[in-house]
């Protein structure tokens, strides 16, 4: 990309804020406007310390056409991170997911179409549903169709993933019908600094730091394909610079691990016994395995992740939560109380 102002939706959330920080650190000629509703998952503190001459925060809703129009008119590209994204919450009340993930995306792509600007849509591998465990597959997870690929059939299994699938399809349709200059990325599970403590890794880490016994859904055999949020940021920027309009790119770091292994790794790295946790009731419709095949992104665009050793990135993440207790402690009691209502 050439030097230009960009609009980042959801830029005060976990993944969006890490992208904004990456841009500020590594692309000094780019000005970033962040549009964020500042729901519970967004936090102005996620952008603290960033220079005011590089980053502007606008508090607003991506489904508000007037605000979106004003900001899109001043931007050369929109990078769309904003989303309702917690599966458990989508099972309790799907309506915010429909409004934000579908109607919000519609509002943004209409503005991008109006001003003929570049649009990148950040999505999830959960739109593809889930996969069998490696031991149950003929190629043990490495055969054809045993990982998600850009053309894998959509098969979402929750209100969250179905609304993300719907937003992906809107973007694809606007590319074909109206010539929208858009790309899509689907990524695996992110980890790193600034992630809300309701999510798996920060919940376990902050439980230990709060002298609360960690909790593990079901059997712990569910597999996630972990990618550090820094690598997600570099992947999105690479797609912005080199991606072909209308194409979908997958971002993953070959980080497949089951939840039990990750939890035991956290406990070990934090000086606890690997068995110092409780199994709790599983989530309804809990997807079994996610796995990304990022070959297309790596070979066509030359992207590669920095954090290829998961435990190195995990240790960095644990240290961040240890060093930034003031960022998460105030919300801890409330978050755990919500989980307790579901015996989780």
Predicted regions span which residues?
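N-terminal Rossmann-like NAD(P)+-binding domain of SDR-like oxidoreductases, especially those catalyzing
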Residues: 1-190, 320-324, 334, 338-344
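Non-catalytic, surface-exposed connector residues within folded enzymatic/regulatory domains
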Residues: 91, 122, 181-184, 198, ...
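Structural element of the ATP-grasp superfamily
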Residues: 108, 171, 204, 297-298
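NAD(P)-dependent short-chain dehydrogenase/reductase
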Residues: 132-147, 159, 169-241, 254-256, ...
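C-terminal substrate-binding subdomain of Rossmann-fold SDR/epimerase-dehydratase oxidoreductases
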Residues: 7, 32, 60-63, 208-344
């Amino acid at each position: 990309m050439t030097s230009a102002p960009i609009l980042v939706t959801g830029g005060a959330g976990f993944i969006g804020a890490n992208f904004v920080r990456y841009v500020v650190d590594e692309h000094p000629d780019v000005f970033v406007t962040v549009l964020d509703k500042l729901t519970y998952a967004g936090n102005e503190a996620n952008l603290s310390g960033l220079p005011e001459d590089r980053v502007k925060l606008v508090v607003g809703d991506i489904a508000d056409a007037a605000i979106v129009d004003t900001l899109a008119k001043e931007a050369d590209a929109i990078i769309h991170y904003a989303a309702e994204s917690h599966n458990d919450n989508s099972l309790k009340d799907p309506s915010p997911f429909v409004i934000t993930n579908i109607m919000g995306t519609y509002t943004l792509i209409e503005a991008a179409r109006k001003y003929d600007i570049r649009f990148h849509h950040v999505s999830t591998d959960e739109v593809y549903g889930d996969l069998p465990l490696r031991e149950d597959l003929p190629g043990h997870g490495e055969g054809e169709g045993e990982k998600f690929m850009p053309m894998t059939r959509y098969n979402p299994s929750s209100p969250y993933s179905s609304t993300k699938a719907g937003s992906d399809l809107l973007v694809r349709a606007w590319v074909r019908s109206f010539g929208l200059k858009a790309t899509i990325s689907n990524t695996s599970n992110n980890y790193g600094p600034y992630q809300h403590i309701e999510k798996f890794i920060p919940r376990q880490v902050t439980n230990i730091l709060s002298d609360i016994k960690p909790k593990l859904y079901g059997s712990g055999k569910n597999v996630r394909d972990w990618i550090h949020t820094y690598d997600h940021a570099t992947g999105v920027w690479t797609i912005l610079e080199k991606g072909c309009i209308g194409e979908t790119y997958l971002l993953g770091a070959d980080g497949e691990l089951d939840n039990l292994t990750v939890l035991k790794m956290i406990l070990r790295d934090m000086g606890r016994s690997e068995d110092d946790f409780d199994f709790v009731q599983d989530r309804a419709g809990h997807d079994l395995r996610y796995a990304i095949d990022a070959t297309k992104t790596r070979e066509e665009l030359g992207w590669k992740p920095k954090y290829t050793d998961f435990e190195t990135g995990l240790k960095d993440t644990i240290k961040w939560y240890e060093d930034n207790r003031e960022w998460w402690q105030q919300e801890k009691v409330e978050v755990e109380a919500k989980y307790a209502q579901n015996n989780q």
